From Swiss-Prot:
Species whose genome carries this gene: Drosophila melanogaster
Function: Acts as one of several non-catalytic accessory components of the cytoplasmic dynein complex that are thought to be involved in linking dynein to cargos and to adapter proteins that regulate dynein function. Cytoplasmic dynein acts as a motor for the intracellular retrograde motility of vesicles and organelles along microtubules. Required for spermatid differentiation. Is not required for polarized transport in rhabdomere development and appears to be a non-essential component of the cytoplasmic dynein complex.
Cellular compartments annotated: Cytoplasm, Cytoskeleton
Known partners and oligomeric status: The cytoplasmic dynein complex consists of two catalytic heavy chains (HCs) and a number of non-catalytic subunits presented by intermediate chains (ICs), light intermediate chains (LICs) and light chains (LCs).
Protein name, entry field: Dynein light chain Tctex-type
PANTHER family according to UniProt: DYNEIN LIGHT CHAIN TCTEX-TYPE, T-COMPLEX-ASSOCIATED-TESTIS-EXPRESSED 1/ DYNEIN LIGHT CHAIN
GO MF annotations, alphabetized: disordered domain specific binding; dynein intermediate chain binding; dynein light intermediate chain binding; identical protein binding; protein homodimerization activity
GO biological process: determination of adult lifespan; microtubule-based movement; mitotic cell cycle; retrograde axonal transport; spermatid development
InterPro entries associated with the record: Tctex-1-like (IPR005334), Tctex-1-like_sf (IPR038586)
Species classification: Eukaryota, Metazoa, Ecdysozoa, Arthropoda, Hexapoda
Sequence similarity: Belongs to the dynein light chain Tctex-type family.
UniProt superkingdom: Eukaryota
Cellular component, GO, one term: protein-containing complex
Length: 111
């Protein structure tokens, strides 16, 4: 594969690492606090976007984040995309600590 094409691909492992770092930096070892969730989710998505756009890859990004208290409730989600499997991609990370779950999805759409 050509190096320039490799450099511009959506690499799931790299995106996953970016997401995990954004979550750890923002939430880390904090306990769930309802009044901070809105701020945390905003910071997580902004941190992800900042890192991803600094890479200057030819993508438009969509980032979603959800924080949920661990209280035994269930959660089911789904997403569907119509895109080019050769150039576009997605990555979802589920992170948790003792009191909460954080689920972040990044969709990369080639320009």
């Amino acid at each position: 594969m050509d190096d320039s094409r490799e450099e511009s691909q959506f690499i799931v492992d790299d995106v996953s690492k970016t997401i995990k770092e954004a979550i750890e930096t923002t939430i880390g070892g904090n306990a769930y606090q309802h009044d901070k969730v809105n701020n945390w989710t905003g910071q997580v998505v902004e941190n992800c976007l900042t890192v991803l756009t600094k890479e200057q890859k030819p993508y438009k990004y969509i980032v979603t984040a959800m924080i949920m208290q661990k209280n035994g409730a269930g959660l089911h989600t789904a997403s569907s995309c119509y895109w080019n499997n050769d150039t576009d991609g997605s990555c979802t990370v589920r992170w948790e600590n003792k009191t909460m779950y954080c689920i972040v999805s990044v969709f990369g759409l080639a320009v």
